[in-house]
Amino acid sequence: MIWEAIKARALENCARIAVGVGPSYADKTIECAERAAENGYARVTLVGSKPMDATLDTVVSDTPDVALIQLLRDGRVDGVVRGSLGASSTLRSLKRIMGLDRILRVSLLRAPSGRFFFFAPVGVDEGWTIQDKVELGEKGVLLIRRFGIEPKVGVLSGGRMEDRGRSPRVDKTMDDAEAVAAALRVGGIDAKHASILFEDAINEYEYILAPDGVCGNLMFRALCLVGCGEGYGAPLVGTDIVYVDTSRAGSGYENAICMASALVKGTKA
């Protein structure tokens, strides 16, 4: 249901999306972008540091991360996908050029079973306090509601319910998870403490919050880069700016382009 809703919105919009092309995964990025365009998800422009052999429009720049974000700032595209450009440099350019103080992202993941769910935090510097996780929860729910989905939120911790008392550190993660879920419920969100049982949470919740950014990043890598799951992109939340982050080692650039196009408001195909 989640992915079908996103695809339908992307096909309706067919928005103008710019995609970053890094040297390490250039061929894969171009192939995915061409498939996204062929499928009608978006009108794609490729941005890289070297000339590209592609059927799509291209922009070549010595600083492709800067050029990518400038296209968005200048209104020449409706949204951007980081693609295979470096994370740190592209996020720095995004913050500087678009005037953002901080970056919050929520990933869409597919489990090996085929079940889709949104997941955060995925950045190692995100989600380290109760307030951070509540903010990610609230803003992530707003994003998900844009696709006509009312999500249930599962807040993970470091242990099963019966593990309380075994470790002060584990106890704190459980206390934090309870506090986050309670705060989200006050705001009208269906949220529960889901303990450490990620494997069960995937089947019960549309949106899952990890204990912190390092845990979230490790879980993403274990599921999508080592296991048989897949990442479909991590859009910004808390802003109308359409920017979808990706993992250079991932395979989901076509999906991230679809996600970006679906998030654009007021676009006609």
Label for each model-derived stretch:
Residues 1-201, 206, 215-269:
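Anion-binding alpha/beta catalytic cores of soluble intermediary-metabolism enzymes, centered on
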